[in-house]
Curated annotation (Swiss-Prot):
It comes from the Bacteria. It comes from Rickettsia typhi (strain ATCC VR-144 / Wilmington). The gene is udg. GO terms for molecular function: NAD binding; UDP-glucose 6-dehydrogenase activity. Belongs to the UDP-glucose/GDP-mannose dehydrogenase family. NCBIfam families: NDP-sugDHase (TIGR03026). It catalyses: UDP-alpha-D-glucose + 2 NAD(+) + H2O = UDP-alpha-D-glucuronate + 2 NADH + 3 H(+). This is UDP-glucose 6-dehydrogenase.
Amino acid sequence: MNITFIGSGYVGLVSGIIMGYLGHNVTCFDNDDVKISKLNKKILPIYEAKLDEYLKQALESDRLKFTNIYSNDFRNVDAVFITVGTPSKELGEADLKYVYDAVDKVSKHINKDCLIVIKSTVPPGSCNNIIAYLKAKGFSFNVASNPEFLREGSAVEDFLYPDRIVVGVNNQESEALLRTIYAPLIEQGVKFLVTNLVTSELIKYASNSFLATKIAFINEMADLCEKIGANIKDLSQGVGLDQRIGRNFLNAGPGFGGSCFPKDILALNNLVENYKIDCKILKSVIKSNKLRPGNMVAKIATLLDGDLKGRNIAILGLTYKAGTDDVRASPAIEIITILLNKDVYVKAFDPIGLENAKKNLEHKNLLYFASAVEACESVDIIVIATEWSEFKELNWQEIYDLVKSPMIIDLRNILDNEVMKKIGFRYYAVGSKI
């Protein structure tokens, strides 16, 4: 099949590259000239495990190309996937201006039988509104919904071996075309769920909001564990081993971040409020997560006897989770911002996300370092803010000899308490009593 992706950000890029690898002829479009130039030279603008290998294979097989030009080549396309961003407006509502801009432009270049597939995360009802919008302009394209469920850090595996493929359609032609596109995965036994447009759109919001709820819940259980002496790791395992619940997203920490969970739960809350539904769960999760970075700073302050001003603090990990270079809505960045506002000197390190962090946050009291060891030199406390496996392998004995005060607060519970204490550190983790 001939497929085009409009928007070569995280979703469009991963989806387009893997679709090319699966045997389709793929064109990825983006307005960013520099990005397109780099992609044509096999240079990825994002970090994603194994994606560079698939990019190379797809390009060498001549099944993938990148462009910044809307051209007549689009007239031979069977399906156009819209994968542009849908950022939050001030009150949490999804901003669809990039979606409509993409729809406007492609509608002028594609053939009448081309299927427009909305892969961007959009509020329920959006596809029907787009159909009406196109009809008012004299177009009668089929429009389908096909939400993505890719996790940054494991997106390639998620695309190739998904739990399910969800499509929302309003006719058999659209369903048949999407079945053909996803045939390589369906033939492997992947569940292909067909529903209507609105339900498909809502599935994405409901899924992400439910996962965010699991994270907020286990974080609050960690707070209880601190008070009563329970073990949060054992609690997470004991709860997660129940197959009705599952073990994923039950790791206590500094809160959820990234480009999806915070945005999507806000958008879903905005949607239910528009329909005069008082969804207390969503509001509670949003509030709980918003307070989480501040709560982490309060724990740091307690360990430093309530005196933060002028302290030197090392922050190890800047991305919102391991396996990605994405610092959007990162709890680590939120924590650093709060600390800087309290006149703290911050020394920061991340194995992958350093450059993105530098673009996101600059301050006279914030220094970025090329190694964790350098960042820890002469600090009053070390904060593990992201669960990078590299941090487990650090020479902690060397770091112990360099710090001003041998104290660690592990916001991701990745280090071994006994090992750290044997070296000589005062070690505290989320869910343990301070």
